[in-house]
C-alpha cells in the first residue's frame, strides 16, 4: 500500500545543510565577525549533512519497502500568463536513491575535510561551500518542476566556481574556475532553450503535467521545417547535460577542476554537479523516448567521451588528473546507457560510481598528504608499506572501477555493455566497440596509477621537485621525506566508502534494474527500445551474473589491461619510454588533449575577442559614435551655421526669402492642380 511522506521531513533534507552552510559561512568567517571557531563550524556543517542523510535513508526505506511517494507543490512563487512558477518536491525511487548518495558521500567528504584542510586559512569558508554545494544538489534532485531544477542546476555551477577557485591567490585556480563557469554557460544556453520550448508548447514547467502532454508534443514540428519539436527539445536539454556532466566537446573544464582542494574534487566527481546531467536526462526519459534521433545523438556523444577521454588518462602523471579522466570516461558510459534507453542502468552506474570514485579521490588526497604534497606518480612507488589503509582501500576502489566480478562497478558497467549490445539504434555498433575498448583502457590506466604509487621501487627521494609543493598544497609542511599514513579522520571515510564500493552492486542490482524500483520515475517504450527487457531475460541473479562475467569479453579485456600495466611498469619499466619515442606523434596529440584547449583559446576565445574588437571599433566607435552620435551633432551644427547666415538683419535679405517662399508655394499649388 502506497504511503505519503512528510513534507516537513523532506524540507529538512536540503535545509539542514543550508543552515550549516550559513552558520559556517557567516558566523565562522570575517564576514560575520568570526563568532564561531573551526570546531563549531565543522560540527554544525557535519550535523546538518548527517541530519539530511538520516532523513534520506528513512525516505529510501519508505519508498523501497512501503511504496511511499510524494509529489506536491510547497510554494507558488508567481503565476505569469498561466505559467506557474513553483517550489515543490517529487520523491520517488530515483529521487530517494540520489538523496542517499548525495548526502552519504557529502558526509564522508565533510569528515575527511577535517583532516585534509586542518591548516588551511579558509577552513570555515570551505565547510560553508561544501554544505552549500550539498544543499544545491539536493534541491536539484528533489524538484518536481523544471524551474526549481534550473535553479539547483545553476546553484551547483556557482558553488563549483567558488570551490574550484577556492585558493583564489593561485592564477591557475582562478583560470580553472572561470573556465568551468564559461563552458557550463555554453551548455546552460541549450538547457534554457529546452526548458523554454517545453514551457512554450506544453504551457507548464511541472514534470507530471509536461510528461502528460508528451504524445501531443511528439506530433508537433517547427513551422517550415521537418524538425520534430521533441527532438529539438531533447537535444537542447542534452546540451545542458553535456556541459554539466562534461561530455565531449564540453568536457574541457573537468580536468582543470583539480585545481580545487581534493575533497571538493571527490564531491564534484562522485555525487554532485557532474551527475546532475545524467540525472536530468533520466528524469526526462518520457521525452527522450519519443526521439530516436536524440537517443542516438546521446549514445554517440557518450561513446566518444568514454573511449577518447580514457586515452588521456594513460599519459597523466598527476595522481588527481588520472582519476579525473577516469570520471570523464565513466560519465561517458552512463551517457551511452541513457542513449540505449537503459536509464535505470545509467543511474545504477551513477550510484556505484559515486562510491568508488569518491573513494579513489579521497585516497589520492590521502596519498598527497602522506607524500607531503607530491602529486607526481613518477616520484612515488613503494607507498604500500607506509600507508596500509590507503593502499588497501585504493586497491578495492580500483577493482571496482575496472569492473571486477562481484565488485560494485562490475554489475553496473557490464549491464551498460550488455544494454548497448542489445540496442538497435543508429550508432549502437560504434558505442558497443567504444565501451568494450574502454574497459581495456580503464584497467590499464587504473593499474598504471596503482603500481606506480603503491608498488615497485621507492622513488620519492629522487623527486627533483621534492622541496616544492604540488598545486593541492594547503598549508601542511612535512619535515620528513618518508611517506606516512593519514590520520583516522581521513582514513575512516576511506573505509566507509570502500564497503559499498564492494557490496552495493551485488545487493541492489536486482531490485533497482529488474524489481521495478524506478518504475514510477523512468519510462521506457519497450516495443521500440527493448534493451532493458533483453537484459531482464538474461539476468539470473547477481551471483550467476558474476560467474558468467568471468567468461565474458569485458573481464578478459580488463584483465589484459591490468596485466599489461603490471608488465610495463613493474617488470619492464623501460618499455613505456621506448613506446613513447616510437609513437611520439600520438603522445603529442594526447599530451595536448586533442588540442581542444588550444582550439578554444586560440580560435574561439581569440576569434571572439577579434570579432568584439572589430564590432567595437567599426560598429561602436565609427558607426554609432562616429556617424550617429557625433555625426548628428555635426549635421545640426552645419545646418545651424547655414541658417544663421540667413539671419543677417538686412531687410532686402528677408524680402528675397519671402519672394523665394512665395515662388515655391505657387509652384507647388500649380503642380497640385495641373
List each language-model region with its residue ranges.
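Aromatic-capped, Gly/Pro-kinked transmembrane alpha-helices
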Residues: 82, 87-90, 510-556, 566-674
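Membrane-interfacial helical/loop segments at transmembrane boundaries in membrane proteins
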Residues: 69-84, 206-222, 412-423, 511-544
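Hydrophobic alpha-helical membrane-insertion segments
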Residues: 47-63, 187-200, 394-402, 493-516, ...
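Hydrophobic transmembrane alpha-helices and their helix-loop junctions in integral membrane proteins
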Residues: 108-152, 158-480, 506
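Transmembrane helix-loop-helix hairpins at membrane boundaries of multipass inner-membrane proteins
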Residues: 1-11, 15, 27-128, 201-225, ...
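Alpha-helical transmembrane segments and their helix-start/interface "positive-inside/aromatic belt" motifs
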Residues: 36-51, 178-190, 385-395, 450, ...
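Membrane-entry segments of alpha-helical transmembrane domains in multi-pass membrane proteins
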Residues: 2-16, 36-47, 83-101, 139-152, ...
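Transmembrane helix-loop junctions and nearby membrane-interface residues
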Residues: 25, 29, 56-67, 107, ...
Amino acid at each position: 500500500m502506497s504511503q505519503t511522506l512528510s513534507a516537513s521531513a523532506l524540507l529538512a533534507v536540503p535545509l539542514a545543510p543550508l543552515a550549516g552552510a550559513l552558520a559556517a559561512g557567516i558566523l565562522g568567517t570575517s564576514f560575520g565577525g568570526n563568532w564561531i571557531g573551526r570546531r563549531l563550524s565543522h560540527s554544525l556543517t557535519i550535523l546538518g549533512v548527517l541530519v539530511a542523510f538520516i532523513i534520506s535513508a528513512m525516505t529510501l526505506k519508505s519508498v523501497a519497502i512501503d511504496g511511499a511517494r510524494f509529489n506536491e507543490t510547497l510554494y507558488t512563487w508567481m503565476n505569469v500568463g498561466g505559467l506557474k512558477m513553483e517550489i515543490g518536491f517529487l520523491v520517488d525511487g530515483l529521487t530517494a536513491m540520489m538523496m542517499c548518495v548525495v548526502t552519504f558521500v557529502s558526509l564522508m567528504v565533510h569528515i575527511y575535510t577535517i583532516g585534509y584542510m586542518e591548516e588551511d586559512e579558509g577552513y570555515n569558508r570551505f565547510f560553508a561551500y561544501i554544505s552549500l554545494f550539498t544543499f544545491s544538489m539536493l534541491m536539484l534532485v528533489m524538484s518536481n518542476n523544471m524551474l526549481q531544477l534550473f535553479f539547483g542546476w545553476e546553484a551547483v555551477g556557482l558553488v563549483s566556481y567558488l570551490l574550484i577557485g577556492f585558493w583564489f591567490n593561485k592564477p591557475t585556480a582562478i583560470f580553472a574556475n572561470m573556465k568551468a563557469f564559461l563552458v557550463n554557460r555554453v551548455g546552460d544556453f541549450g538547457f534554457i532553450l529546452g526548458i523554454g520550448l517545453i514551457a512554450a508548447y506544453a504551457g507548464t514547467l511541472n514534470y507530471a503535467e509536461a510528461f502528460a502532454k508528451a504524445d501531443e508534443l511528439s506530433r508537433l514540428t517547427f513551422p517550415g521545417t521537418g524538425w520534430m519539436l521533441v527532438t529539438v527539445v531533447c537535444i537542447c536539454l542534452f546540451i545542458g547535460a553535456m556541459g554539466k556532466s562534461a561530455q565531449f566537446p564540453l568536457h574541457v573544464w573537468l580536468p582543470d577542476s583539480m585545481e580545487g582542494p581534493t575533497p571538493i574534487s571527490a564531491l564534484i566527481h562522485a555525487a554532485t554537479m557532474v551527475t546532475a546531467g545524467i540525472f536530468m536526462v533520466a528524469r526526462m526519459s518520457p521525452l527522450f523516448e519519443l526521439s530516436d534521433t536524440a537517443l542516438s545523438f546521446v549514445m554517440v556523444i557518450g561513446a566518444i567521451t568514454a573511449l577518447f577521454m580514457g586515452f588521456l588518462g594513460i599519459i597523466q602523471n598527476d595522481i588527481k588528473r588520472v582519476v579525473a579522466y577516469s570520471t570523464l570516461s565513466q560519465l561517458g558510459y552512463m551517457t551511452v546507457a541513457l542513449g540505449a534507453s537503459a536509464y535505470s542502468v545509467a543511474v545504477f552506474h551513477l550510484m556505484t560510481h559515486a562510491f568508488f570514485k569518491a573513494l579513489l579521490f579521497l585516497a589520492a588526497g590521502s596519498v598527497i598528504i602522506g607524500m607531503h604534497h607530491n602529486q607526481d606518480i613518477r616520484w612515488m612507488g613503494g607507498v604500500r608499506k607506509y600507508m596500509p589503509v590507503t593502499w588497501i582501500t585504493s586497491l578495492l576502489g580500483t577493482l571496482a572501477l575496472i569492473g571486477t566480478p562481484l565488485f560494485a562497478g562490475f554489475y553496473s558497467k557490464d549491464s551498460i555493455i550488455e544494454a548497448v549490445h542489445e540496442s538497435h539504434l543508429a550508432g549502437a555498433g560504434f558505442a558497443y566497440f567504444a565501451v568494450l575498448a574502454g574497459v581495456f583502457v580503464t584497467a590499464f590506466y587504473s593499474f598504471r596509477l596503482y603500481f606506480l604509487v603503491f608498488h615497485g621501487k621507492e622513488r620519492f627521494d629522487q623527486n627533483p621537485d621534492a622541496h616544492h609543493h604540488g598545486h593541492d598544497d594547503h598549508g601542511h609542511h612535512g619535515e620528513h621525506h618518508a611517506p606516512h599514513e593519514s590520520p583516522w579522520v581521513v582514513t575512516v571515510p576511506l573505509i566507509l566508502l570502500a564497503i559499498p564500493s564492494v557490496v552495493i552492486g551485488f545487493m541492489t542490482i536486482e531490485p533497482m534494474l529488474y524489481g521495478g524500483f524506478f518504475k514510477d520515475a523512468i519510462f521506457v517504450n519497450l516495443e521500440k527500445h527493448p534493451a532493458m527487457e533483453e537484459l531482464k531475460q538474461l539476468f539470473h541473479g547477481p551471483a550467476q551474473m558474476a560467474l558468467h562475467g568471468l567468461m565474458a569479453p569485458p573481464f578478459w579485456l580488463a584483465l589484459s589491461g591490468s596485466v599489461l600495466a603490471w608488465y610495463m611498469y613493474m617488470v619492464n619499466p623501460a618499455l613505456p619510454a621506448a613506446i613513447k619515442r616510437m609513437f611520439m606523434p600520438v603522445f603529442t596529440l594526447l599530451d595536448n588533449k586533442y588540442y581542444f584547449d588550444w582550439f578554444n583559446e586560440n580560435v574561439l576565445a581569440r576569434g571572439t575577442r577579434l570579432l568584439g574588437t572589430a564590432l567595437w571599433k567599426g560598429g561602436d566607435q565609427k558607426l554609432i559614435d562616429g556617424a550617429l552620435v557625433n555625426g548628428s551633432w555635426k549635421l545640426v551644427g552645419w545646418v545651424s551655421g547655414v541658417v544663421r547666415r540667413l539671419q543677417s538683419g538686412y531687410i532686402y535679405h528677408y524680402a528675397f526669402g519671402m519672394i523665394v517662399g512665395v515662388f515655391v508655394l505657387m509652384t507647388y499649388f500649380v503642380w497640385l492642380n495641373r
